[in-house]
Curated annotation (Swiss-Prot):
Domain RCK N-terminal: 1-118, 222-339
Residues reported to bind NAD(+) 2: 226-253
Keywords: Ion transport, NAD, Potassium, Potassium transport, Repeat, Transport
Protein name: Trk system potassium uptake protein TrkA homolog
Annotated RCK C-terminal domain residues: 138-219, 356-436
Gene from which this protein is expressed: trkA
Domain notes: The RCK N-terminal domain binds NAD and possibly other effectors. This is expected to cause a conformation change that regulates potassium transport.
Binding site for NAD(+) 1: 7-11, 29, 71-72, 95
Domain of life assignment: Archaea
Biological role stated in the UniProt entry: Part of a potassium transport system.
Length: 436
């Protein structure tokens, strides 16, 4: 497929890197240093303004199967998206940072002609709400048009899974543990693998079966949630959670902002105060929270809030992190989940591309996850156990038409099956060769 990307920032660069091996990728970037960086990839790079019609025509946007507008400027993204659609691009996906342009994380079939508008701020809020809603969840990735979810969960101390072999967990029939991240290393588990507190497990499940996982790896429900920062992310997360949580508290330092939201967020207790004041946190009983979300405008403040909350007894701490390079640092010092808006955008765009039959990679704790389509007739009718897969590779799910199957060794492959394969990064080329 022909894919034109406007913007070679973090999102655009990583999309180009993942798509280039299997597609014709053209990327437009105005900044010289970013242009030079992306030029090193196997792509056609054009130095120019994506809102300029001549630049768009030089990129051949009229022949594009997909046009992705992910520059750091909302107006450039919106204008280039309109122009791309007008001259013939089949699918146009536009990122907008300002939530005034959209009222939900993803808007499809926009009246102005965009196929998809994505708001990173609202998408991050939605992701935070999903993680809080599944106790122990660290990351959730959707595949195959929403039929399959890959969830990374942390095994909590004293949970049903702590100290048990996988075979003894009696997981629901359509659920499989595909990988375990333990002590900095990835393991592909077997039935006799014993889980331990602190393990991070990647689980593949039918979307409708996710609810059945609650209570196995952590507590069954999240009852008390505290959110720090009443900006777009904090207030939208509170709005989502208030529909199903027993107690949602939103803490904000600005009295003006608190007053503005007081009549808007039904079921949310809004408190004005300094989130870095330890006495205030004790008074508000933050230590009794099942989950806290630090969503202020400062990375440093979010880190401090998270660590203070955990120290007081909060079970899970999630923090918004603007600087992508801080994500690993936050998690290394005790933050359970660090969410970066640009990473969330990348994941959302990748998810949309998968629904357009563009196969892309995902990653959970260093394990590569690739979705492959079976079109090699030599493989049709073969049982999974007879495939020459690398020793540590595992097929986590099969999507067949509108049906999702959690496979066993004797499951046979059919033409056009979509397989979700977990493997180590250095084995991806071999896997692609098998299904080519």
């Amino acid at each position: 497929m022909r894919i034109v990307i406007a913007g070679a920032g973090e999102v655009g660069y990583h999309l180009a890197m993942s798509l280039a091996p299997n597609h014709d990728v053209i990327i437009i970037e105005k900044d010289v240093s970013r242009f030079e960086r992306v030029s090193e990839l196997d792509v056609v790079a054009i130095n120019g303004n994506a809102a300029n019609m001549k630049v768009l025509r030089d990129a051949g946007v009229e022949r594009a199967d997909v046009f992705l507008a992910v520059t750091g400027n909302d107006e450039v993204n919106l204008l280039s998206g309109l122009a791309a659609k007008k001259v013939g691009a089949k699918n146009v996906i536009v990122r907008v940072e300002n939530p005034e342009y959209v009222d939900r994380p993803i808007v499809k079939e926009h009246p102005l002609g965009y196929d998809v508008l994505i708001c990173p701020q609202l998408s991050l809020a939605q992701e935070a709400a999903r993680l809080i809603g599944i106790p122990g969840a660290i990351e959730v990735v959707t595949f195959s048009g929403g039929k399959v979810e890959m969830i990374e969960l942390q095994v909590m101390e004293g949970s049903k899974a702590d100290g048990k072999a996988i075979a003894d967990l009696y997981l629901p029939q359509n659920v499989v543990i595909a990988s375990i991240y333990r002590n900095g290393h990835i393991e592909i588990p077997r039935g006799d693998t014993v889980l331990r507190a602190g393990d991070r497990v990647a689980i593949v499940s039918k979307t409708e079966d996710v609810e059945m996982l609650k209570g196995i790896f952590g507590p069954p429900v999240t009852r008390r949630v505290t959110i720090f920062g009443a900006g777009t992310i904090g207030s939208y997360t509170a709005k989502i959670l208030a529909k199903g949580m027993t107690s949602v508290k939103l803490i904000e330092s600005s009295m003006e902002r608190c007053e503005a939201l007081s009549g808007e967020l039904e079921g949310v207790r809004i408190v004005c105060g300094d989130a870095t004041d330890i006495e205030f946190l004790i008074e508000e009983e933050i230590g009794k929270s099942d989950a806290v979300l630090a969503a202020t405008e400062s990375d440093e403040k979010n880190l401090l809030i998270s660590l203070l909350s955990k120290n007081l007894g909060a079970r899970i701490a999630i923090a918004k992190v603007e600087k992508r390079e801080y994500v690993k640092l936050f998690e290394a010092v005790g933050v359970d989940v660090a969410l970066n808006p640009r990473s969330v955008t990348y994941n959302e765009v990748s998810k949309l591309l998968r629904t357009m039959r563009i196969e892309t990679l995902a990653e959970i704790e260093g394990t590569a996850v690739v979705e492959v389509v079976v079109r090699n007739t030599r493989l049709v009718g073969k049982a999974l156990k007879d495939l020459p897969l690398p020793k540590d590779a595992i097929i986590g799910a099969i999507v067949r038409g509108n049906e999702c199957l959690i496979p066993r060794g004797d499951t046979t492959i059919e033409y056009e099956d979509r397989l979700l394969v977990f493997a180590k990064w250095d084995e991806i080329e071999k896997i692609e060769e098998i299904f080519r």
